Amino acid sequence: EERLEKKITQRMEEKQQEYVQEIKMQLIKEELHDVETPQTKEKLEELEKLDTVHLTESVMQRVRPQTLRAIVGQDRAVEAMESKLASVYPQHLLLYGPPGVGKTTAARIVLNEAKKLPFTPFGPDAPFVETDGTTLRWDSRDMTNPLIGSVHDPIYQGARHDLADTGIPEPKPGLVTEAHGGILFIDEIGEMDPMLLNKLLKVLEDKRVKFESAYYDESDPNIPAYIRKLFAEGAPADFVLIGATTRDPSEINPAIRSRCAEIYFEPLVPADIQEIVRNAAKELGAVMEDGVAELIST
């Protein structure tokens, strides 16, 4: 009887440990659904604290043109951009010209002006998404593609913890979706990888990005609604493309040229540079000696 009591006691202890462990695991799973932990909350507070600290704004921010009239030496180019973008049917554009003549600034300001028009398709919150064709990188297997978008599989690419545990792939929309309803500005578009450019052309035609994954099972009841929608319908990507380049038009992919209106920005002449220098000095409250603007322009 004593041996039996010992066995009963031992079995009860084992069952208790199993029960405690089961409760512990359940609590851990519940906590995982709350993505915020004391550590992540602390890091968020640190970031928000950093955001409250500002040094003086850069000189470039101060002197950058804020209106179309402030853009020097590019009257014809700016007028052409207005006619192409500030319309009921805005067109994709290719901007040619040397660096530093105001291509990006003009595009941003024209969008802001176009949003004020009653007939424009651009909404008040239409985004201006800017990237550089020389730095765009992607994986030929589409495991990583910040421009078009990609799918993070649950095994190799570190999907969200709750998705990785259930084996659910997660689509990651790219810059083309971020620019939906607005403008995607690609500086040095002539330097883009040709295959990536072809993918971009496909998006321009479809106005949508499709996602595929061997790990996606549409019958899985655990798939979140947003992931199911992305795999079923794709991500919207209806935007106006503006590509800027310092290359000669003959060096640009004919397929992209055929879809875009072309605008040429002129090199700045000494008189333009002198006007820019004087405007900058006025904006900064600086006093220049005679001949300084002329010296800079030579």
Task: For every predicted segment, state its role.
Residues 2-55:
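Interdomain "pre-motor" coupling segment immediately N-terminal to P-loop NTPase/helicase cores
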Residues 82-84, 144-183, 224-232:
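Conserved alpha-helical scaffold flanking the Walker A/P-loop in AAA+ ATPase domains
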Residues 116-150, 155, 218-220:
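AAA+/P-loop NTPase substrate/partner-engagement loops
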Residues 117-123, 154-158, 249-255, 265-297:
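Conserved C-terminal "switch" segment of AAA+ ATPases
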